[in-house]
């Protein structure tokens, strides 16, 4: 019914504005096929394969990281039936869905613990650790990514209080140290993936910030946006 109304209304508007009799007749005669095509689109999948000719391998608008055919076939076999997603087959009892990847991620990265979410990792981290407290972040790293996601907005939504420090082009480790107070819940660093500040610049390395955090017993949160555990430089990628 919606398709009938939409296509009919579109035809009425065209007839009211156009003086092209031939086109009016053509559109009137094709009204029923147009309605059928519009209705068919409602039940057709929207996602379609495309060719990435942008030069950007991990394209945020084109699906980001790809899954190999081998792993895609394995996933198809899993998601098209029942699985042990939250069931411990050895114990014969309820399990944790995170157990399938946590140990592997810890082994690969050397982390003490690991968690995976499908989105909003930074906001979830800030909300869990920093709600109501202060989080210093460099003024030169207050990024905005596609979709109008801004660091200040994410901080506010999480309940954390953002403390911007340094200047647009230079931030020193001492800026972070001076910003620490009794209300500080974490130190933050954001990867500027979609722009660069060049020239008379200075920034704090993740290692230096982590050392400061350890010395003050304050967690350090680094928002990488995306990353890779394998060095792709030999392949000409950066």
Model regions: which residues?
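Conserved PLP-enzyme active-site core in the AAT-like
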Residues: 44, 92-238
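N-terminal Rossmann-like NAD(P)+-binding subdomain of aldehyde/semialdehyde dehydrogenases
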Residues: 15-25, 44-66
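Asparagine-centered polar/low-complexity signal
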Residues: 52, 61, 84, 118-120, ...
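Long amphipathic alpha-helical segments
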Residues: 1-40
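Catalytic, metal-anchored helix/loop core of enzyme active sites in primary metabolism
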Residues: 34-36, 59, 90
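Glycine-rich phosphate-binding segment of PLP-dependent enzymes
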Residues: 53-54, 65-90
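Short glycine-rich or small-residue beta-strand-to-loop segments that form or flank ligand, phosphate
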Residues: 57-61, 88, 136-138
């Amino acid at each position: 019914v919606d398709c009938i109304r939409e296509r009919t209304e579109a035809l009425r508007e065209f007839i009211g504005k156009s003086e092209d009799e031939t086109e009016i007749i053509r559109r009137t005669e094709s009204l029923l096929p147009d309605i059928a095509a519009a209705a068919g689109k409602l039940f057709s999948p929207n996602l379609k394969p495309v060719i990435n000719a942008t030069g950007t391998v991990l394209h945020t608008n084109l699906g980001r990281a790809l899954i190999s055919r081998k792993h895609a076939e394995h996933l198809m076999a899993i998601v098209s039936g029942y699985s042990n997603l939250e069931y411990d087959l050895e114990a014969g009892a309820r399990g944790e869905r995170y157990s399938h990847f946590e140990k592997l991620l810890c082994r690969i990265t050397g982390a003490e613990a690991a968690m995976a979410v499908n989105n909003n990792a930074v906001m979830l981290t800030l909300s869990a650790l920093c709600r109501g407290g202060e989080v210093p972040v460099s003024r030169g790293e207050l990024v905005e990514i596609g979709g109008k996601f801004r660091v200040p907005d994410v901080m506010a939504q999480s309940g954390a209080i953002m403390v911007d420090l340094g200047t647009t082009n230079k931030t020193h480790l001492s800026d972070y140290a001076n910003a620490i107070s009794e209300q500080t819940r974490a130190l933050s660093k954001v990867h500027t993936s979609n722009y660069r500040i060049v020239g008379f610049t200075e920034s704090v390395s993740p290692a230096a910030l982590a050392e400061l955090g350890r010395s003050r017993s304050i967690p350090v949160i680094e928002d990488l946006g995306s990353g890779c555990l394998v060095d792709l430089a030999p392949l000409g990628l950066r």
